[in-house]
Amino acid sequence: MRVLELTQENKKNVLDELIKRSPNHYGEYEAIVADIVENIKENGDKALFEYTAKFDKFELNADNIRVTEAEIEEAYASISPEYIEVMKEAFQNIKAYHEMQVRNSWFSTKPDGSILGQRITPIAKVGVYVPGGKAAYPSSTLMNIVPALVAGCERIVMVTPPNSEGKVNAGTLAAAKIAGVKEIYKCGGAQAIASLAYGTESVPKVDKIVGPGNIFVALAKRAVYGYVSIDSIAGPSEILILADETANPRFVAADLLSQCEHDEMASGILITTSKELADKVVKEVDGFVAAAPRKAILEKSLSNYGYILVANSMEDAIEAANDIASEHLEIITKNPFETMTKIKNAGAIFLGEYSSEPLGDYFAGPNHVLPTNGTAKFFSPLSVDDFIKKSSVINFSYDALKAVHEKIELFAEKEGLYAHANSIKVRFENE
């Protein structure tokens, strides 16, 4: 890891490098994805089956594309009872947390008798993308399904790629069963996203698509955005730890590596006011990496985006943290709650030395689908809000409209919209 002193002179250059870490040039991939999306749109199942044979090495057809109930039960039975119980408890925690986010419709009656309000309705059809292979995480299955479930979406469809034998990851299917989702289709990649967006003979069209994936999935979501809603275009995982001299260096090192092991583009950043802590964390990181099963990935991610910044004050450290706007922010200081009050930008905030980031990944309840690459400045974690729609409601009586009709007519005429004005005038033309 690189240890740098964070000064007023170098702050801009250092932070620019950290914030702009993800590549923005995907030209060759964009062309491939555009072709896939258009082919699915035009040819439906035929194109989907061809892509599955090409990329997943499995001969998909209309008879085997949907995961059967027997396949779900077989997968569920193959998972250890201990793991099933952990997933069930995690599901309940996630569900309870998201139930606190539920919004209700509201109506307000004004003194003139007019009624204004907001009606909340769930998005009807949602598609959840779940990666396969080494990136198949049952926790992500739960995190993407539960807020849609709590919102009341009437149809939740899941897509996930099969292996060459037509099998789907057992943990993914077990998590889906626990969450109550039974409509699951064996398809992945950009072709699965396009199938959900436009519909095929076998895969239903949905209104919103959520879920993580590789660059092809991300670009496909971007390509269909506007035709359907999407959650976000997620980048590589990232963690930022704010710590003072009271922090345990071994805890800090372990937490940094918890995100760096995801992939070579993941970032782990410590901002501290203690040079002594910084030096100790470096030693602890080296020790953990040497014995880590994912040593090669850790070494690469730390080489690319592993930083320890030593700030002159906690105020400077907090300012830098707000500029970076990390996906995960741990605060390990003498008074973490006080420090948190000064944080403006972060996807999820973990307070104190016993609130390690994996709590949020798996078990605590808040969603682990979080804004990345600085987008926590304007985006939020996946929530029930992502699966609802808000409709404004207006009800005016004759008397209520009569009291204001001339003002509305004036406004419309000043904007040159005379049919707008007439829509009001016609109601009082005989008076």
Where on the chain are the PLM-derived regions?
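Conserved small-residue-rich beta-alpha loop and adjacent elements
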Residues: S108-A174
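Conserved NAD(P)+-binding/catalytic subdomain of aldehyde/semialdehyde dehydrogenases
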Residues: G180-S258, H262-S267
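Flexible, glycine/charged-enriched surface loops at secondary-structure junctions
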Residues: R103-S108, A266-I271, A291-L302, I332, ...
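C-terminal core of ALDH-fold dehydrogenases
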Residues: D323-E431
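N-terminal Rossmann-like NAD(P)+-binding subdomain of aldehyde/semialdehyde dehydrogenases
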Residues: M1-A124
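Short internal beta-strands
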Residues: E154-N163, G268-S274, G352
